[in-house]
């Protein structure tokens, strides 16, 4: 069993949602740790990589056991499914960056509010459609996939390459990224 370190490099603003709002100011806030720093939840990474493995399996032969070991298998009425054998940590800023940002009180500079509104067919904004979301500026975060079976390392590396966008609005220009294996 091996731990695989990875890095997510964001090339555009990104938003992993917390499910919270800031009253009348912002409709959707970014998920943050107790120090107010952004991170990508491990379950988000796991879901994206599972989706990537599923897409990849349409082009190359991937053993179902490998997908089940890495991501688990959901159950149904006839089968209880199975849990994955690996664990995905949250992807966070590197320790040096965290310490610098916190000690210099720079957390507020990591975020931007972006406003949008719905436009009618006649080109005029719809009433009451203004929405503001908080986004994180482009940066890099790091995570670990723990307890990876040696025979699944190559599949995991291939799924990293498949992910090109992450988070809210990933089909509208937010969250453009690259995931790469470290070390």
Residue ranges and their predicted role:
Residues 1-111, 128-183:
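RNA-binding basic/glycine-rich loop and surface signature characteristic of RAMP-family CRISPR effectors
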